[in-house]
């Protein structure tokens, strides 16, 4: 049958070419038209494959060459060619070979006064010009001159032909040669004039497509440097800017405004950033490295512009896909285990990091109380591992009880009650019940200072609530000589009064201890100040915050404002009000501009420029010893007025996209709010967008290549109080000093009879800061051989975090993990009794301290140094890897290794793991995969977390091994230590668009009122610190269930877990009944039933005395 159809079509096409009978030709054209008018494009492609294009073109040439040409045949022929040509990518080449190109051009010239005939010719020329090379050929043959005869000033006649002519001209101008020809012949001015004329007369917007066609011509010309120069010389920026200002809100004008925006952005002159140098404002002399002169920015003429277009996109193009050509396909590299990168005898030094393997219970007891409140030994050679004496164990007496009470209160509800159900952790605002205050029961003695920590830095503030001068609240660091002065005692009294008057108790935080710790934190430029939020502390807000709904056109408005600066420079103040590169001070307290400051721990703001009265351009600092990685920001701002929107434009961001385009907001901390009892980082800002700007890096900095692009993050903030002091940050800050304070408070809070908690110094960093290593497990029940044997043979779990300083969310997740592991939660107790946790909570302290986003003080990404780290340049990575080597060498490789990270391009929380087979399958390298033996247990933990953790999603997890990730912790620990469950856990800076956190507060209120079901595709909730800490605790729960599902799980642990689950089942059932009775959040009810299925699974396995089967 197919052969008959093919032969029938071929007969028709052959007859069409060979027949000279008009009626036969018209009949065949009608039949072909009917065949192609129904069905899918497959019919057109089929006809093309059988020579349909050639047949139509040949008929066109033959008919056109008859005298006179028969337009009864030519018009339907042109219509068919227009339809077929849209699907035939080679139509232009075929037309050239069969001389149809010239024939059509001749026919168009002959029909300038015949509207319908000309229109059909233009349709054919449009498809021929779809090929750039054919468009160039048409330009050589005078097509553009012809088209300019068709495109006239505003008229209501022959508008179809004029529209078609603009479309053909736009296609021709894709050719660079045609573009240059248009510039040389002055067509840029002509096109601008035509557009102005049509715009001014077409008040009803009836001919928007003609105006768009004219603009497309200009856009293609502007792709050339000469075209942009001609456009600017013809005042094109001013003309297009003014013609669009009155129609920005008109939806019918969207096609025009979109192209105008592209042209204006394309023609905006590129310029260097307003910085002295592209290098960081801070420099650190790296041992053994020669310091080079940082490259300085060059004048504008040094900048190349690639002329790329950028459309105002609102679609989420998060970079979740791995390029197949980056996948590792070498089976030997994937499956082989490299040798040690250091002498084997060197691993012995890490025994001091595993004292739990050698302590007897008597030795451990004798150590308790030793070195009370002593400082960690400071080592002159920071590349050597400290001796065992530097360990800090359970060394605090029971009278330090307040922190324990904080912890007990915070975890009195078991973690099992907060799994992926309609849990209380989605804290929604309510006037009747604002939610349980986790901080009311914290006793005031949590702020008590030890006598050894009397050297308290200076906080200056008025303690009177009615006479606040909050801009005077600052926290300078103090030298040792000054700290003993009378002034210090006076300041301490002020601090005490201020804290007693205003402080809201923050669990696991002590301002006095923080200030004492801050004095011992070493920074590159020796910061003299501390940020108020870090000293005062942070409490999670009582309610969650939904993702910001982005209003249509926000980005467009901000770009037009950028363009206004160029064409109306008199409106721009352009005053530098803060700069790390300029002499201090630049700001006058009496001036009416905002005051900025960032020279404190983790702070990052390099320069602030006042653009307009309430608008500022900001530039963030590059990483120390680097010219890159501008993303993290954290700075103080004061001198504001309330109820006025201030616009901030961070103009030197590097990433091509950001979650700020998809619902994310920066964070804000108000000092006045904190003194009113709300010490909280909140998401803030409106009119947020992220887009490419006109700044470029110079070719000198880029090493001779075309300079990279920069992007602008813009947002507006309406401050809650006038003359407040506020802090703005990319994400919730978490400093190194906060970590060291937190660890000490945790150490004081543990129950010495139950929890084995020890701090070691893994090493000293390049900057001279100790990198902490924490060990957590359960104390042995007694000093009997049996109990000590069980204590020493517990499997290890290794968790690390914050290798990238800007990923502060990783530290909040780690905070949740640490607090949960030392808590009295029954799940935490089971975990301590069955595992030893080795935790390195901050792998890059120097980067965190100095406000870096990605690198250490050496200017290197430490998570790309795991293959062969240097003890001198990357000490934390070198010794972290050494510790893992040591555990592997004694047969104690961790069950799970996980490195906590933050992700700037995707939502939710997810894991990256490693799999040989999945990598090869994805790369389509299936040869030999059948012989590769690989366990599938690497998928078990992600599946567990997907069922338990509200923020986690399995759909974003990946187990591919990329070449570009070969030197990361995840891949190196997997390959070299043989840890099959080696992961990177990524937490979004933004929030969740799945699971319980998918529902926004506004929708929940509507659902409750209307008894409606939530709809899919919601924006979801932004992460707060509460949700991040919860994820850290849920990760721990996942480790327990992973062990329960393993074939090696002991019957004793199964029995303990069954008892625990039975105790929790009643509470979960009551919670489920409440949800059912209120008909609230049906999805969450499903999650609750799902959790009951999990618990029943473990109980059945216990009753049947069968170990659970590994998840496949």
Curated annotation (Swiss-Prot):
Its EC number is 3.4.17.-, 3.4.17.24. Zn(2+) binds at residues 804, 807, 901. Residues 291-345 are annotated as: Disordered. GO terms for biological process: C-terminal protein deglutamylation; protein side chain deglutamylation; proteolysis. Expressed in corneal endothelium. Belongs to the peptidase M14 family. Residues 299-329 have a biased composition (Acidic residues). This is Cytosolic carboxypeptidase 4. SUPFAM superfamilies: ARM repeat (SSF48371), Zn-dependent exopeptidases (SSF53187). It catalyses: (L-glutamyl)(n+1)-gamma-L-glutamyl-L-glutamyl-[protein] + H2O = (L-glutamyl)(n)-gamma-L-glutamyl-L-glutamyl-[protein] + L-glutamate; C-terminal L-alpha-aminoacyl-L-glutamyl-L-glutamyl-[tubulin] + H2O = C-terminal L-alpha-aminoacyl-L-glutamyl-[tubulin] + L-glutamate. It comes from Homo sapiens.
């Amino acid at each position: 049958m197919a052969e008959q159809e093919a032969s029938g079509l071929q007969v028709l096409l052959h007859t069409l070419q060979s027949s000279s009978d008009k009626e036969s030709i018209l009949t065949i054209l009608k039949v072909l038209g009917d065949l192609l008018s129904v069905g899918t494009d497959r019919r057109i492609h089929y006809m093309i494959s059988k020579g349909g294009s050639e047949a139509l073109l040949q008929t066109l040439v033959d008919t056109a060459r008859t005298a006179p040409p028969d337009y009864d045949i030519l018009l339907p022929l042109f219509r068919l060619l227009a339809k077929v040509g849209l699907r035939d990518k080679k139509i232009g080449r075929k037309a050239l070979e069969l001389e149809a190109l010239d024939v059509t051009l001749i026919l168009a010239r002959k029909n300038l006064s015949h509207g319908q005939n000309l229109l059909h010719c233009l349709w054919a020329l449009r498809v021929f010009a779809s090929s750039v090379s054919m468009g160039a050929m048409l330009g050589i043959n005078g097509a553009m001159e012809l088209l300019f005869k068709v495109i006239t000033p505003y008229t209501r006649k022959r508008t179809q032909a004029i529209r078609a002519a603009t479309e053909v001209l736009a296609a021709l101008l894709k050719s660079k040669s045609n573009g240059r020809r248009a510039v040389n012949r002055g067509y840029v001015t002509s096109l601008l004039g035509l557009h102005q004329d049509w715009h001014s007369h077409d008040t009803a917007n009836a001919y928007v497509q003609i105006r768009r066609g004219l603009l497309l011509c200009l856009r293609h010309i502007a792709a050339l440097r000469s075209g942009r120069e001609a456009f600017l010389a013809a005042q094109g920026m001013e003309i297009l800017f003014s013609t669009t200002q009155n129609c920005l809100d008109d939806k019918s004008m969207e096609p025009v405004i979109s192209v105008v925006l592209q042209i204006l952005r394309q023609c905006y002159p590129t310029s260097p950033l307003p910085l002295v140098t592209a290098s960081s404002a801070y420099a650190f002399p790296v041992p053994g490295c020669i310091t080079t002169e940082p490259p300085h920015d060059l004048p504008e003429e040094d900048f190349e512009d690639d002329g790329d277009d950028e459309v105002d996109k609102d679609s989420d193009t998060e970079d979740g896909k791995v390029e197949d050509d980056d996948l590792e396909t070498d089976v030997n590299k994937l499956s082989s285990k490299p040798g040690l990168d250091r002498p084997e005898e060197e691993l012995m030094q890490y025994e001091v990091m595993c004292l739990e393997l050698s302590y007897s219970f008597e030795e451990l007891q004798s150590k308790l109380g030793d070195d009370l409140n002593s400082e960690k030994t400071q080592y002159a050679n920071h590349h050597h591992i400290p001796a065992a004496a530097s360990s800090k164990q359970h060394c605090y007496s029971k009278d330090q009880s307040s922190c324990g009470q904080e912890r007990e209160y915070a975890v009195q509800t078991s973690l099992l009650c907060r799994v992926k159900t309609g849990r209380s952790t989605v804290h929604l605002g309510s006037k009747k019940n604002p939610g349980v205050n986790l901080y009311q029961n914290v006793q005031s003695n949590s702020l008590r200072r030890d006598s050894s920590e009397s050297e308290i830095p200076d906080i200056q503030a008025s303690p009177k609530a009615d006479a606040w001068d909050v801009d005077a609240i600052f926290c300078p660091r103090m030298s040792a000589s000054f700290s003993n002065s009378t002034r210090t005692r006076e300041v301490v009294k002020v601090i005490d009064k201020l804290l007693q008057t205003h402080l809201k108790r923050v669990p696991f935080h002590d301002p006095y201890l923080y200030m004492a710790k801050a004095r011992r934190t070493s920074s590159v430029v020796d910061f003299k100040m501390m940020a108020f939020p870090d000293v005062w502390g942070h409490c999670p807000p009582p309610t969650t915050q939904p993702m910001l709904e982005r209003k249509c056109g926000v980005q467009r408005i901000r770009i037009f404002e950028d363009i206004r600066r160029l064409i109306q420079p008199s409106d721009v103040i352009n005053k530098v009000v803060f700069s790390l590169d300029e002499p201090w001070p630049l700001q006058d307290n009496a001036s009416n501009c905002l005051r900025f400051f960032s020279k404190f721990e983790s702070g990052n703001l390099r320069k602030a420029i006042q653009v307009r009265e309430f608008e500022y351009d900001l530039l963030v600092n590059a990483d120390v010893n680097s010219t890159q990685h501008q993303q993290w920001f954290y700075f103080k701002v004061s001198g504001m007025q309330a109820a006025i929107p201030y616009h901030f434009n961070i103009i030197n961001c590097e990433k091509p996209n950001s979650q700020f385009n998809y619902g994310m907001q920066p964070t804000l901390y108000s000092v006045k709010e904190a003194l009113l009892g709300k010490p909280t980082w909140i998401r803030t800002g409106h009119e947020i967008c992220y887009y490419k700007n006109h700044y470029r890096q110079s070719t000198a900095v880029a090493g001779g290549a075309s300079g990279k692009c920069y992007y602008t993050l813009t947002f507006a903030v309406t401050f809650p109080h006038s003359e407040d002091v506020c802090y703005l940050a990319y994400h919730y800050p978490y400093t190194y000093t906060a970590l060291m304070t937190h660890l000490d408070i945790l150490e004081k809070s543990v129950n010495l009879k139950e929890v084995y908690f020890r701090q070691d110094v893994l090493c000293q960093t390049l900057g001279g800061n100790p990198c902490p290593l924490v060990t957590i497990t359960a104390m042995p029940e007694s000093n009997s051989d049996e109990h000590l044997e069980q204590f020493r043979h517990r499997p290890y779990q290794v968790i690390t975090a914050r290798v990238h300083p800007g990923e502060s969310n990783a530290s909040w997740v780690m905070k949740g993990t640490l607090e949960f592991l030392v808590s009295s939660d029954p799940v935490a107790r089971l975990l301590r009794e069955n595992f030893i946790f080795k935790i390195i909570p901050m792998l890059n302290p120097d980067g965190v301290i100095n406000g870096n986003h990605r690198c250490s003080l050496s200017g290197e990404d430490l998570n790309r140094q795991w293959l062969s780290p240097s003890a001198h340049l990357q000490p934390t990575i070198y010794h972290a890897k050494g510790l893992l080597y040591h555990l592997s060498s004694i047969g104690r490789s961790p069950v799970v290794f996980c490195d906590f990270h933050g992700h700037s391009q995707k939502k939710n929380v997810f894991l990256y793991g490693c799999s040989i087979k999945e990598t090869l399958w994805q790369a389509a390298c299936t040869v030999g995969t059948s012989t590769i033996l690989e366990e599938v247990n690497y998928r078990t933990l992600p599946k567990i977390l997907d069922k338990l953790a509200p923020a986690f999603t399995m759909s974003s997890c990946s187990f591919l091994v990329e070449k570009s990730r070969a030197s990361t912790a995840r891949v190196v620990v997997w390959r070299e230590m043989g840890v099959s469950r080696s992961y990177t856990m990524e937490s979004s800076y933004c929030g969740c668009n799945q699971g319980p956190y998918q529902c926004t507060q506004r929708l929940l209120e509507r659902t409750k009122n209307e008894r409606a079901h939530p709809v899919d595709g919601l924006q979801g909730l932004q992460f707060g610190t509460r949700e991040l800490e919860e994820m850290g605790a849920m990760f721990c729960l996942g480790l327990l269930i992973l062990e329960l599902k393993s074939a090696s799980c002991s019957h004793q642990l199964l029995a303990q877990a069954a008892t625990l689950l039975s105790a929790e089942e009643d509470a979960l059932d009551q919670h489920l009944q409440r949800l059912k009775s209120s008909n609230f959040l049906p999805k969450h009810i499903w999650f609750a039933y799902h959790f009951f299925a999990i618990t029943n699974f473990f109980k059945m396995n216990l009753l049947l005395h069968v170990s659970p089967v590994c998840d496949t």
